[in-house]
Amino acid sequence: MTIIVDIIGREVLDSRGNPTVEVEVHLENGALGRALVPSGASTGAHEAVELRDGGTRYQGKGVKKAIAAINGEILEELGGRDARNQIGIDQAMIALDGTPNKARLGANALLGVSLAVAKAAAESLSLPLYRYIGGTQAHILPTPMMNIINGGVHADNPIDFQEFMIIPVGASTLKEAIRYGAEIFHTLKKRLKDAGYNTNVGDEGGFAPQFKSAEQAIDFIMESIIACGYKPGEQIALGLDCAATEFYKNGSYFYEGEGKYRDVGEQVDYLAQLIKTYPIITIEDGMAEDDWEGWKLLTDSIGKKCQLVGDDLFVTNSARLRDGIKMGAANSILIKVNQIGTLSETLDAVETAHKAGYRAIISHRSGETEDSFIADLAVATNCGQIKTGSLARSDRLAKYNQLIRIEEMLGLQACYAGNWYC
């Protein structure tokens, strides 16, 4: 039977050495699901609340309160329920929390349980996780968006944009796409070192050189692509995560590295110029999370030429996404499971996007773990795109390696998205 008999929460550490939540769900038939919860650095103001303890322990970042909720109230509520009823379980936890943003029990508590329940149910049915969540139609291997230069709050450098990504749109398989990315990553490392820049990596495994402008970062990446023998725009496209909320000040965008302010119109014009100059096919959070007018202006300007992704704008929240769809803001949504706090709400956001013709991109967080859940989620939803960092750090590679395994499991049914979904 797939009845929940025990739920165990524990405090472990994430990739930044900060506490996070791990949950085990045990079923009556002996099946076990274990999940770890990620954490963001550039968090949107409208995200579900990650419950931290405060005080001096772990500099206030402990998660004992969330663990107590899991081992107490949540276990009491969910014990005896069928793990296959994902929606019912998630709704029960949301009702138990009783707040609009999961602030009482913590989104980190609810998410850990939600994901572990899905894993336990899949295990009990002897199904791969992607197949359990996505059914028989799950077969699209996502095009990876590989963050090989880090800036913003993900790195200790003056670059204002948070991520500079390579996207292997011309590869024929997921495994080949990962090889393309690894070769460019190592070539970039050598070129940076030869130019006198340090090659330490940021939170997501990308390099964090002391560049002062986006153009400088992009030029180094372009040179590395060409040095590897690949064709920019044809085999390798580029993507940006501006994380513009982080440098939005009093109605303008302040570029600290350049010492320059850009008003809303100038910000739109700047991004439009970048996609003319470089083979950039996707821009995430090009405007601040509450600059709705700016988002509409940006979408009207370049939305037919470029994927415009709302991360902080939508925070994996179907209600905010519907507002954006009505307004014509952005044309895609970034999906982060911990922004909303349950698997069923995450899947609802993906479905809402797809029904409206918006793309959905499954994403990691800057504070990650060895858990590879999002790799299975990307295939389960046939989203066709995934962001899971650079080609360094085991917390990032865990997801790439799981995608390689899934591609092998799917065999002839496997279909690499390439540029179809970008």
From Swiss-Prot:
Its cofactor is Mg(2+). Binds a second Mg(2+) ion via substrate during catalysis. The active site is at E204 (proton donor), K336 (proton acceptor). One of its GO terms (cellular component) is extracellular region. InterPro entries: Enolase, Enolase-like_C_sf, Enolase-like_N, Enolase_C, Enolase_CS, Enolase_N. It is an enzyme of class 4 (lyase). Mg(2+) binds at D241, E284, D311. Its EC number is 4.2.1.11. Pathway: Carbohydrate degradation; glycolysis; pyruvate from D-glyceraldehyde 3-phosphate: step 4/5. One of its GO terms (biological process) is glycolytic process. (2R)-2-phosphoglycerate binds at Q162, K336, R365, S366, K387. It catalyses: (2R)-2-phosphoglycerate = phosphoenolpyruvate + H2O. Keywords: Cytoplasm, Glycolysis, Lyase, Magnesium, Metal-binding, Secreted. It comes from the Bacteria. Transmembrane segments: none annotated. GO terms for molecular function: magnesium ion binding; phosphopyruvate hydratase activity. The keyword Metal-binding applies. SMART domains: Enolase_C, Enolase_N. Catalyzes the reversible conversion of 2-phosphoglycerate (2-PG) into phosphoenolpyruvate (PEP). It is essential for the degradation of carbohydrates via glycolysis. Belongs to the enolase family. This is Enolase.
